[in-house]
Amino acid sequence: MRKFIFVLLTLLLVSPFSFAMKGIIWQPQNRDSQVTDTQWQGLMSQLRLQGFDTLVLQWTRYGDAFTQPEQRTLLFKRAAAAQQAGLKLIVGLNADPEFFMHQKQSSAALESYLNRLLAADLQQARLWSAAPGITPDGWYISAEIDDLNWRSEAARQPLLTWLNNAQRLISDVSAKPVYISSFFAGNMSPDGYRQLLEHVKATGVNVWVQDGSGVDKLTAEQRERYLQASADCQSPAPASGVVYELFVAGKGKTFTAKPKPDAEIASLLAKRSSCGKDTLYFSLRYLPVAHGILEY
């Protein structure tokens, strides 16, 4: 009987639910510097009370933003406060605002660009590995994988080479999981999109799929077909988890967004994968608990 109980406890301890993440993504912006330390610490404590276990920094550099010493120091302080509140920390690396424009280059030019991007990511990883009072629990590649530019196997070879190298070299800096996110807009079939993510998964990089409900480019039924193909529990789906969008995008050319209604957000926050996949939310500033603290 004791042996049976021991085996049962062991299975529970190693079940996928023991490792599934409930994370909130914070997209650092310069205007967030107006938030006081007290406000931020209170917000991090509220996240823990609401069941979140992880804060994901979408990036720690965006173009030239967050390159000044005082900006970096503030990000370090924000990250340390999250860990002090009991949250794990996934550190986003370098984000290039022109990432999607560079994908239209020749294969050779694209390969050269992705190598430069990797060098910038490694610089951020080394910087944050040495940051005082912080121990990153994982790394997030801030570039996003779309379903337009990597449709053929030939076209995605530079992507896969880059991700293979990124996973290996970032892990050399700190042997923690490496993540990236992906989104779909109907440019591939659901099965084709699943195959793309299977190739990404094979590089060792964990991929999260954005649910697309905030940008609302596809119908709910169309989005569900993509999510079932890429992140479902009924079949071996390649995604490590789903990012649920907590915002409603505006209709203009310039991106604007507002939070979804509180009741809809509450329904999304209650979601949990039935097979232990990660559940993430974008983004912190749209959570009701962040209203009056982070502008949107």
UniProtKB/Swiss-Prot annotation:
Keywords: Signal. One of its GO terms (cellular component) is cell outer membrane. One of its GO terms (biological process) is secretion by cell. It holds the Pfam family DUF4434. Residues 1-20 form the signal peptide. InterPro entries: DUF4434. NCBIfam families: PRK09936.1. This is Uncharacterized protein YbcH.
